[in-house]
Amino acid sequence: TRSHCDWSSDVCSSDLILVVLDKTPFYAESGGQIGDTGTIKGNGVELVVEDVTNNGGTSIHYCKGTINEKAKGKVQCLVDGDRRQNIRKNHTATHLMHQALKLILGDHVHQAGSLVHPDYLRFDLTHFEKLTSDQISEIETMVNREILLNNALDISVKNFDEAKKQGAVAMFGEKYGDEVRVRSEERREGKECRARWAALQ
């Protein structure tokens, strides 16, 4: 993702530069999903973005590199697209795992936390006993089967209460407004029965 933005910065240590943009293509860390990385470049600006966090609605870009004290004007932002795509895959896999856990262990299972990384994911859950090897294998098989089906996702914007009534699952740690983005996928359950899972974003 490429974008041109106005900017301001502050040096908080000898090698770490905090940058605030008027708009940003970088996703900030949220709900267990780590922030984007990439570069910010401009006249007298050469930065590598190592992390992005959200502070009261403002995205803070943690960077290393150089900024000329007299630098001004717009900068060009470039997100590491391959890394973001891997994060997106593991984000979707988190939703698939949540649904598989509910189907195999029961509706009492809730997400208690997560970590979505480009190379792996971690899913924390509530359950009354340790999972058996057979249960873990069954969950893994179900998630991998859904991934291999490669079903298209249906993305829509709905009222929060309506989405919840239709069975959409909220992500742990996320805060939602009156309108939410809902991702859903048709899922096969045996030869005849078909169902849908949906997750709020």
Segments predicted by a language model, with ranges:
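A glycine- and charged-residue-rich anion-binding loop/surface
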Residues: 8-188
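Single conserved hydrophobic/aromatic residue that forms the stacking wall/gate
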Residues: 1-7, 11, 186-201
